[in-house]
Amino acid sequence: MDSKHQCVKLNDGHFMPVLGFGTYAPAEVPKNKALEATKLAIEAGFRHIDSAHLYNNEEYVGLAIRSKIADGTVKREDIFYTSKLWCNSHRPEFVRPALERSLKNLQLDYVDLYLIHFPVSLKPGEELIPKDENGKLLFDTVDLCATWEAMEKCKDAGLAKSIGVSNFNRRQLEMILNKPGLKYKPVCNQVECHPYLNQRKLLDFCKSKDIVLVAFSALGSHREKPWVDQNSPVLLEDPVLCALAKKHKRTPALIALRYQLQRGVVVLAKSYNEQRIRENMKVFEFQLTSEDMKAIDGLDRNIRYLTLDIFAGPPNYPFSDEY
């Protein structure tokens, strides 16, 4: 297998490419930009594409995938595509319809991976972020074990090859793993993970359960105004990463991506810039030494860019626990 398409074997037997292309973009970026960027990513060698119903771009991402299949660049089975169940569809009866809606937008027959996007449940309906007249979120109370059973049915129906979770803490993972009658374990937990929040304890726990940790915001953050503290430090300007970049004649972004691959984390790289999309594929062309890895480990300072404070309150808010 050529280095570009290195994969990790999931606990259900399917394979996931260790480098993924993230398609989320801030609200002000036109959605059709996802079409061009995803095509460029596939042309550059990305085979793992990550999106979600929340991102409002699945019709464009699907169009990009289908156009690259149509022109012979890839076959459908070469692509590993991830979608995610949004919080307003946690009730078991809404899970399959939500996935079917994503598939309709994508014009695909199945997704390779379907994730519970975030463990806090929101009021069902068309509104992605339902709020009351005071601007407070409208929550729902759903047993995530029931949501998981509906996810398992989506796998059995062939609509999703694999199923997993995102933004779950250890307690929430254990709740699923210890569920009576569990049919399929989550194959992965996709979480914010980068040198400033290296998730060591969660990573060790996931490894012990044969669950893959997938890193989003691996390059720091998109720093989108409503969501991210504008005073938080910029990861890619970190002096240690910059020094290592100089040493290896690479970019700080490549150092941050390579760090994750060497600790057994699947990493998502998001860029809509053609040069950087191509650049990020070079992560397989070099290695960090154990000293380099130790230096990056030393950067961990528990900085979470995406705290999603508006979701705080319900017991399922995941970021109150240590990990």
Swiss-Prot record:
It catalyses: a 3alpha-hydroxysteroid + NADP(+) = a 3-oxosteroid + NADPH + H(+); a 3alpha-hydroxysteroid + NAD(+) = a 3-oxosteroid + NADH + H(+); (17R,20S)-17,20-dihydroxypregn-4-en-3-one + NADP(+) = 17alpha-hydroxyprogesterone + NADPH + H(+); (17R,20S)-17,20-dihydroxypregn-4-en-3-one + NAD(+) = 17alpha-hydroxyprogesterone + NADH + H(+). The keyword Ion transport does not apply. Pathway: Steroid metabolism. Its EC number is 1.1.1.-, 1.1.1.112, 1.1.1.209, 1.1.1.210. GO terms for cellular component: cytosol. Potently inhibited by benzbromarone and 3',3'',5',5''-tetrabromophenolphthalein (TBPP). It comes from the Eukaryota. Cytosolic aldo-keto reductase that catalyzes the NADH and NADPH-dependent reduction of ketosteroids to hydroxysteroids. Most probably acts as a reductase in vivo since the oxidase activity measured in vitro is inhibited by physiological concentrations of NADPH. Displays a broad positional specificity acting on positions 3, 17 and 20 of steroids and regulates the metabolism of hormones like estrogens and androgens. May also reduce conjugated steroids such as 5alpha-dihydrotestosterone sulfate. Displays affinity for bile acids. This is Aldo-keto reductase family 1 member C1. It comes from Macaca fascicularis.
